[in-house]
Amino acid sequence: SGYKGDNELEDEIANRDPRLYQLIDNNHKPYWIRNSVQTQNPMPDCSASGGVSGYPCTKFHSADEAQYQARNTTYDWFIYRYAEVLLINAEANAELGTCTQAVLDKTINQLRDRVGMAHLTVNPVADQKPINYGYQLSNLLYEIRRERRIELVNEGFRMDDLKRWNAMKVFENPLTVLGIRITPTVEKQYKGIATFGGENGRAVIEYNGKTYLQQYTSKALDDPGLKWTANDRRWLYPLPIDQLTLNKNLTQNPGWDDK
C-alpha cells in the first residue's frame, strides 16, 4: 500500500487516498482567509469534542477569498449529499449481487475521479489488514464500505452505518481508542495549546511500545463497554423525556427507562 507508518503526520498521509490529505493536512495548504490573508490551520483543542483525535480537520473550510466574503470561510452544510446517493447505490447493488463495472463507474468512480484516485474494480485486491466486522465480506463489498467511510467522514453517517451493518465488533479494535501518535514533532506543534501525559496533560495511552493520544478517556483498551450485545440498549437512542410527557402512548425504548 505504500503506508509509511505513524512516526510523523507526514508519514501517515504519504501515498494514501488524496481525501486523507484533504481532510487532516494543515502544513501544505491554507485553511481559511483571515483579514485577506490565507492562514494555516491551527492545531485543534484536543480537549474539546471537535478535536479529541488530535488530528486537525480541514473539511468544510475554504481558503478561497470569495468564500470568506460570502460565508465566513465555511461551506454550507450538506442537506442532500449526492455522494451518499452514489455510495448507497453501489452498496445496494453489491448486496444484491448486481454490482457491475458499469455500476461502479457511475457511482464510486465518479467520486474517485474528483480527487484523482484510481478506479475501483469489481474484483479488488483483498485488504491485507481488514477491519473485523465480526463476519466475512466479499472484497467488493468491503471496499465499498471503506469508500463510504472515507468519503463521508465527519458527516454523521458512521454510527448509523455500523448499526445497520450489525458491525459493532469494530469497537473492540483497540485502535479505535487511539488518537494521534505523540512524537516530538506533535508536541512542538501543540506547544501552547496542549500538553500530553502527566497530571495536567491530555490523557495518553501506550500501545505496541508507542504513545498515543487517548481519544476517549473513559475507555481503556480492555473496557467491557466496547463490546455490544444483541440486546444492548445502545442500538436505539432514548426517546426525549419531553416527548414522552407530551404523548402518554409512547413508551421508552428498551433499556432506557432509567434515563
Name these PLM-found stretches:
Residues 1-259:
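Acidic/polar-rich alpha-helix caps and helix-coil junctions
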